[in-house]
Amino acid sequence: MVKSSLQRILNSHCFAREKEGDKRSATLHASRTMPLLSQHSRGGCSSESSRAALHCCSNLGPGPRWCSYVPHPPLKIPGGRGNSQRDHSLSASVLYSDERLNVTEEPTANDKTRVLSIQSRLTEAKQVTWRAVWNGGGLYIELPAGPSPEGSKDSFAALLEFAEEQLQADHVFICFPKNREDRAALLRTFSFLGFEIVRPGHPLVPKRPDACFMVYTLERED
């Protein structure tokens, strides 16, 4: 279960070098908002098919791609603001809220796909925000660019608990650009935590040769 990895996440060196005294903003964004891929989503994959597809990540061929909403490394939108950011939908609704997390959902054209903004409250004045996509039993999260922001380790642990306990997720995916300088450290750390590399051509991730995807399969007790 994911809880068995939470302490290792908190002790992970990828989250250990958080900046102290960062007063640039009361709100820390743990990931840049990513523009969506092409808008031709065909529908989600069932939990059962997801489990079967992920049984052996290293030996899968191409498959159907529903993933037009899946997170991926940011791109500049022609004619846009050029800062890889997009405004949160004014029609976003609250999906879940407790003393640590506030999760809002943005409407999409595909009723099987949910775009989530997950805000983790660290203090009364500071929070970390993750952008994620929920589809077919899988939660897709982009890791932040650059050094981990202060509080990201606790925020990520709370996010995984939310995926397991509230979403009842079958899989949690992370993605980041292949050209990141800390790519090797990320691969080592998340492999130690139980994440597996998702090979190119996997039917549950977008066709993005510039991005690396890893997956954690949540096992439930009977």
From Swiss-Prot:
Domain of life assignment: Eukaryota
Classification via PROSITE patterns: ODC_AZ
Gene3D superfamilies (UniProt xref): 3.40.630.60
InterPro entries: Acyl_CoA_acyltransferase, ODC_AZ, ODC_AZ_sf
GO CC annotation, single: nucleus
Keyword tags: Polyamine biosynthesis, Transport
GO molecular function: ornithine decarboxylase inhibitor activity
GO biological process: polyamine biosynthetic process; positive regulation of intracellular protein transport; positive regulation of protein catabolic process; viral translational frameshifting
Pfam families for this protein: ODC_AZ
The keyword Transport is assigned to this record: yes
Coiled coil region boundaries: none
UniProt record similarity statement: Belongs to the ODC antizyme family.
Record function comment: Ornithine decarboxylase (ODC) antizyme protein that negatively regulates ODC activity and intracellular polyamine biosynthesis and uptake in response to increased intracellular polyamine levels. Binds to ODC monomers, inhibiting the assembly of the functional ODC homodimer, and targets the monomers for ubiquitin-independent proteolytic destruction by the 26S proteasome. Triggers ODC degradation by inducing the exposure of a cryptic proteasome-interacting surface of ODC. Stabilizes AZIN2 by interfering with its ubiquitination.
Known partners and oligomeric status: Interacts with ODC1 and thereby sterically blocks ODC homodimerization. Forms a ternary complex with PSMB4 and OAZ1 before PSMB4 is incorporated into the 20S proteasome. Interacts with AZIN2; this interaction disrupts the interaction between the antizyme and ODC1. Interacts with FAM171A1.
Protein name (database record): Ornithine decarboxylase antizyme 1
Gene that specifies this protein: OAZ1
